Amino acid sequence: MTTFTHINHQGEANMVDVSAKQDTVREARAEAFVRMLPTTLNMILSGQHHKGDVFATARIAGIQAAKRTWELIPLCHPLLLSKVEVNLTALPEISSVRVESICKLSGKTGVEMEALTAASIAALTIYDMCKAVQKDIVIEQVRLLEKSGGKSGHFIAE
């Protein structure tokens, strides 16, 4: 049975010691969906939103969030990210925005939490910018899509 890496033998939470690990190239992709009314999505896409460019703001928020993940999640290591990318795609057929984030580095620990944080905060930023016109926006399906590098190998979500 696999054990939790952040829990010591006394059951206490601790930051994992990665000092003996070798640096490897690590990459992670995550996604989130933001579901809204078609009128709200059209407002974003037409540039008619009174707060400005929703996608540009969400993209920058996601990038900033990835860089600050270690400050938000208590046992995450501060990482020297070499790449953070946040892509937003309008999906009018399901009245949603898909947020995809990609984080990469060469280091001793993975970037899954950074990718998940980037996607989550970008989605929350879309909500924040649009809540004046629609309060019941739904953020859903936040998940890790893929991770590579490190001892645990390559993971691809089904």
Curated annotation (Swiss-Prot):
* Reactions the enzyme catalyzes: (8S)-3',8-cyclo-7,8-dihydroguanosine 5'-triphosphate = cyclic pyranopterin phosphate + diphosphate
- What broad class of enzyme is this? lyase
Q: Which family does it belong to?
A: Belongs to the MoaC family.
Q: Which gene encodes it?
A: moaC
Which organism is the protein's source?
Answer: Histophilus somni (strain 2336)
This chain's function reads: Catalyzes the conversion of (8S)-3',8-cyclo-7,8-dihydroguanosine 5'-triphosphate to cyclic pyranopterin monophosphate (cPMP).
* Quaternary structure, from the entry: Homohexamer; trimer of dimers.
List residues binding substrate: 75-77, 113-114
Q: Where is the active site?
A: 128
Query: Mind listing the GO molecular function terms for this protein?
Result: cyclic pyranopterin monophosphate synthase activity; GTP 3',8'-cyclase activity
- List the Pfam families hit by this protein, alphabetically: MoaC
Record's keyword annotation contains Nucleotide-binding: no
Gene3D superfamilies (UniProt xref):
Molybdopterin cofactor biosynthesis C (MoaC) domain (3.30.70.640)
Q: Which InterPro entries match?
A: MoaC, MoaC_bact/euk, MoaC_sf, MoCo_biosynth_MoaA/MoaC, Mopterin_CF_biosynth-C_dom
- Protein's name in the database: Cyclic pyranopterin monophosphate synthase
UniProt record, GO biological process: Mo-molybdopterin cofactor biosynthetic process
Q: Which HAMAP family match?
A: MoaC_B
Query: Keyword set for this entry?
Result: Lyase, Molybdenum cofactor biosynthesis
Q: In which pathway does it act?
A: Cofactor biosynthesis; molybdopterin biosynthesis
